[in-house]
Each structure stands twice: as C-alpha cells, then as structure tokens.
Amino acid sequence: QVMRATYGAVGSALGTGVGVLVALLFMAGVYALNRGMILRRVQRDRHEHVDSYGQIFRTITLVVTPFILSTAVYNLSSTVNNSIYTKWYPSLRNLDTVSIYEKYGIFSGQSLTMSNIPIAFASAMASAMIPSVAQLMAARDVKGAREKIGLAVKTTMVISIPCAVGLFVLAKPVISLLFTNKTAEELNLAAALLMTLSLSVIFYALSTLNSSILQGLGKVNTPIINAGISLVVQTVAAVLLLMFTRLDLYSIAIANTLYSGMMCVLNQWAVRRAVGYRQEIVKTFVIPVFASAFMGAAAWAIYEGLYMVTKSMRISVIPAIVIAAVVYFVMLILMRGITEQELRSFPKGYLLVKVAKKCRLLR
C-alpha cells in the first residue's frame, strides 16, 4: 500500500514535467516545419529596429509572471487547507495525526480530484479565450468582445451545471466506480465530501473562465488580487468552522467552496466593470439549472432501479450517466436554453445538431 502511494506520488510529480516537455517538443517541431517560411518573412521585413535578446526576455517575463503568480495563488488554496487541517487542527482538538492525514488524503485524493475533472474542461476553454478576447479589444471591438464573453460563459455553465448536479446525485457510485480498493467507510466519506464540493464545480469553472477573460483584457493583476482576497476569506472561514463547529473535514470542503464562490463573484464583477458587460440570466443559468434538475432526478431513479435488480453500483451507474446526459440534452433544447448556432459552437456541435434534427428537437 505504501509503495503504491509512493509510485502514485512520483507519477503525479513526473506527469507535470513530462506534459511541459512534450509541449515544448511539439512547439519545436512546429517551428522546424515552419522555419523556412518564418525566415522568408524576416528577410522581407522592412523594420529597422530589432529588439535585443534582453528586451525580448524582459517582455516575456513581464507577460508570463502574472500568469505564474495567479497559478501559484490558486494552488495556495489547497496548501493552506492542508496546513490548517493536518498541522493546526490536531493540536486544537488533541486528535490522532495519522487519522487526520488519512482523512485528508481521502478528501484531496478522491473527492477533490473528482470535482476537478469538470473544471479541466472550463480551463481548456478559458485558455482559448485569451487570444480571441485580446484580439477583439485590440481592434476596439467592444461589442464583439461582449458577445464572445457571453457565449463563453453560457457554454461553460451549460457544461458545468449538469456536471455539478451529476456529481451530487451520483457521488457514491461514481467514487466506487473509480476507487475500487477503498473500504466502505472511506467511500462513504469521499462521497459525502464530493457532494459538499459539487457546488464549487460551477464556481471554479466560471471563475477560471473570467480570470482568463481578464488576462485577455490586459487586467493581468486583477485575478491575482481577487485570488488573494478569496484565500484570506477561505482561511478565516476554515479556522472559524474548525474552532466553533464539529464539522471536522467538512469545514475544509465548505471553505473550499466559499473560496471558489468568492473568486467567481470578484472576477465576474471585474469583467463587468472592464467591458460594461452583463450576462444574460435565463438561458445561461436558470434553464440549465432546471434541465439539470430533471437530469438529476432521472439519474437517481435509473440508478436506484438498476441497483435494486443488479445489486452492483458499477453496473448501475454507467447506464444512469448515459441516460442522464440524454435527458439533459433533450430538456435543454425543449426549454429553448440553447440555439442551433450556439450548439454548433460546442465540440462535435455539428453532429449534435444533426442528431437533434433527426429526433425533431430542432427544426
């Protein structure tokens, strides 16, 4: 068990470095393929001033540093929670340190990991937003930037809201499906913590997107300041909950959700101030919530029905997830929460439109 944990830690540490190395090699390959064209463009260039390597390095540093600091502050959230719960809390309550570390391992290794999966999709979309928003603002096309931001926020909510509901409703079977070597007690704790964290999926998705939008608008320091404020609020909340309640590890889950919610509100407010932007409410938030509620009810009913017959969580949860996704897709279109044009902007959007038209959901 110790060796497996060690290899897991080594793998997670190596994964980050290998990912960056592969990206660097990919960029080098792209440059090698386009080197001839780049050199020809350089020869045709008529600019007399050429930046020195020092100036180029300084410019890159000034651009990249805020992104690095922002990521560092984001990661501090988990570090602070870890320190509070595993180092300060045991001395406060005179608790066994080994038990505390085991419980926090369940929180960070299972519940938090599962809640981060949907957020990864929002992060990918957020990365794609920076150049497009920056381009529109450079062209002084504020209206175009607002439309782009509005569509990105709506797309993020259409994906993250059902993910949050799905994780809440199917927390235990999903955890059991992916973590097969855990005891029933560990699975129950991980599932309960995942349910507590499910709301943070929506908050993190929106705050991550808005953070990238702000960076695309040139407000590179704003997300860092907002993350710092949210970190202070989270720390105070975690300490107070651990001191004055018996919520134990749930205090950390609640504080984590509060952190993401605070980030979401502050970043959204900053984007609104920067471009005078107001998000449409009904189709972006209300309809996805109602469609997700129907989806959640269907997922729970199908899972419980299949579990009564099969007595297997793993066999029951997969059909429940698939049918729940279909129910959400149908309800979202029937409630007119998404247009054909918006649906085409999704990954495999043209295929989704084709399926919807075949099923007569779209005309």
Go through each PLM region and give its residues.
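Membrane-interface helix-loop junctions in multi-pass transport and translocation proteins
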Residues: 1-25, 29-30, 221, 231-265, ...
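Interfacial segments at transmembrane-helix termini and the short loops linking adjacent helices
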Residues: 168-201
